[in-house]
């Protein structure tokens, strides 16, 4: 990427729900690039599994334990196929497989950090994100003006 293009600034205006969705998508992207494929680390898989389990609650023959074990086994097999370099772990903060991990981490963690400050919660996101990636930090701030009902 040339310096002129990388120094251009862009702005996205969205509501809080949309901001959370962007952060979730980037978190999932970052985790998948780092080889984190488990029912608990992969947000999309976790949400789909929970929906399936809730829907299956009405089925007499649904075996929650069997479903959970089979899902986890399948995800481990998928991870081994896609990430043979991570036999028993994953790449995470500081892993140098691709700068996209650090770049996406920087963005989603900054969003979560700002939401955590706004909610005055005591989560892991209360602290600013560690510097990572090659693109530098982003700026996330709440716009004071109300642009309509937030979803």
Features from the language model and the residues they span:
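Positively charged, low-complexity terminal tracts
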Residues: 2-151
């Amino acid at each position: 990427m040339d310096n002129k293009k990388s120094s251009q600034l862009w702005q996205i205006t969205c509501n809080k729900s949309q901001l959370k969705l962007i952060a979730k998508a980037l978190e999932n992207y970052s985790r998948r690039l780092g080889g984190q494929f488990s029912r608990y680390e992969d947000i999309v898989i976790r949400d789909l599994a929970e929906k399936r389990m809730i829907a299956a609650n009405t089925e007499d023959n649904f075996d929650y334990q069997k479903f959970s074990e089979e899902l986890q086994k399948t995800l481990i097999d998928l991870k081994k196929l896609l990430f043979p370099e991570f036999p028993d772990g994953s790449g995470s903060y500081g892993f140098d497989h691709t700068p996209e991990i650090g770049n996406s981490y920087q963005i989603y963690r900054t969003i979560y950090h700002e939401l955590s400050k706004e909610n005055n919660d005591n989560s892991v996101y209360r602290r600013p994100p560690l510097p990572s990636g090659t693109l530098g930090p982003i700026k996330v701030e709440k716009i004071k003006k109300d642009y309509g009902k937030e979803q």
